[in-house]
Amino acid sequence: MRVKGGSITRQRRRRWLKLAKGYWGHKSIGFKTAKQAVVKSWTYAFRDRKQRKRDFRKLWISRINAAARNQGISYSQLMHKIKQSNIEINRKMLAEMAIHHQSDFENIVKLAIAKSA
């Protein structure tokens, strides 16, 4: 006896269409294109979770560089002096200090220059 499996097929398709809700055009109503769009979005999500880490690191470096140049030192020289003087602070915190706590950032720059000299 043949089993048609219509309800299971509908459930499976409904699940994919639910994942594609909000997509533009036929990607939200056509099963095949919806499935392709969802799989592609997962690919982008996986890739961009890695990319986000690189983007934030670039942002922190550019912010630290801008603040460091106001103090008369380049980013690379500052990081070298911080490492030489055994100041354990990461780029995220340095960038945060450079924007919101300028006086503390200036103190770290002065300390790094003084200790490494």
From Swiss-Prot:
Give yes or no: UniProt keyword Repeat: no
Report if keyword Zinc is assigned. no
Q: Which GO terms describe its cellular component?
A: ribonucleoprotein complex; ribosome
Write out the entry's keywords from A to Z: Ribonucleoprotein, Ribosomal protein, RNA-binding, rRNA-binding
A Pfam family matched in the record: Ribosomal_L20
What's one GO BP annotation on this UniProt entry?
ribosomal large subunit assembly
Q: Which family does it belong to?
A: Belongs to the bacterial ribosomal protein bL20 family.
User: Which PANTHER family does the UniProt entry name for this protein?
Assistant: 39S RIBOSOMAL PROTEIN L20
Give the protein name, as stated in the record: Large ribosomal subunit protein bL20
Quick one: which gene encodes this? rplT
